Amino acid sequence: MKKISLFAFALLATLTATAQQMPEGSLPARFKVSADKEVVFARGNLQYTTQGEHTCADGTTQKGTWRIADNQYDIIGYENEKIAEDYTGYIDLFGWGTSGWSGSGAKCYQPWSLSPTINAAYSYYIGGSGTNNLTGEYAFADWGVYNAISNAGNKPQLWRTLSAVECTYLFYHNYWTLAAVNGQFGFMLFPTDFNEPAGISVKYVWKQDSANIPYYFEPTDYAGNSYTYEQFVQLENAGAIFLPSAMIRLNDNKIPQGIASLGSYWSTTQNYAEDDTEALGIGFGMDSANPNVTLGRCWGRSVRLVHDVDSKTALNNATTKSKAQKVVKDGQVYILHNGELFNILGTKQ
């Protein structure tokens, strides 16, 4: 009887491990954010409380607990006005770069930071400059890079925030619309291989079906996109991303009235905003959507994290790679993987 070699065992282990494990809290669909990069989204918006403690990418342990919302449509709402170092509830609207990293060089770097002055935005300058991004040497100012997210892998550097260029790529190269989930308004994004679940229809604002992306439109362009929780579960499982209209918080910690349909999400990018006191991010309302809306960095916006997918090893949206198996054929030992046969040297038969 032939014995399987150590090389064959190594091959077996390698082939079996080709399916990359996504972090806890990941949504199933993969989205291209550039020609050669894909991400998966966290299942909900980022939230923070001053209670507890967590580990950070620089090896320190910091005050507070970070988590992602249980559902894509969950928001904190007007409770964000209670933001303070001694507030023990959760918030989900943050100033730009407020990961808690003291090395950022910004005066306001904590998630509870406020600077209610006429020059408030200057307190959020990363590295002492108005043109630095939350990348490279300042990547720890990115909430997902610096912090362990308690219910999403609980390790630093598992997640990150999209850049403005990546947000633009998402807008142009995928499908999107506006919708309501059990009454919660928001922006809905779909991968290009999205198939509508049986009995559920979607009216798209953008489906790569015109020369120019429609930054402005009418509510009639997405009329009928209203879904129950149960229907949304099916949409989510099919690949839909939902960014709820979680509103914005001004630098005086107030949320304006009458903006329940407004959603605004940070990117890591400042360096091509029109004003050094601002940074870029996704913004939308009932009649507009734009991947690069500028707002004062002292304002509180939502954060939706992503995890980078290794395209060589990641799972497909709809299928799971099978485990490799040892098989014996005509007295020879082979490795069977995804329906293909390999010899012990790794050569496909």
List each language-model region with its residue ranges:
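Positively charged n-region of N-terminal signal peptides that target proteins for export
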Residues: 1-4, 19-20
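Short, small/polar residue-rich loop motifs at catalytic or cofactor-binding pockets
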Residues: 335-337
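Conserved positions within compact, well-structured domain cores
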Residues: 21-311
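Residue-level detector of functionally pivotal "anchor" positions at catalytic/ligand-binding pockets or at interdomain
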Residues: 308-333, 348-349
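Short, glycine-anchored, charge-dense loop/turn motifs used at functional sites
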Residues: 342-347
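Hydrophobic h-region of N-terminal signal peptides that target proteins for export
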Residues: 10-18
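Sec-dependent signal peptide hydrophobic core
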Residues: 5-9
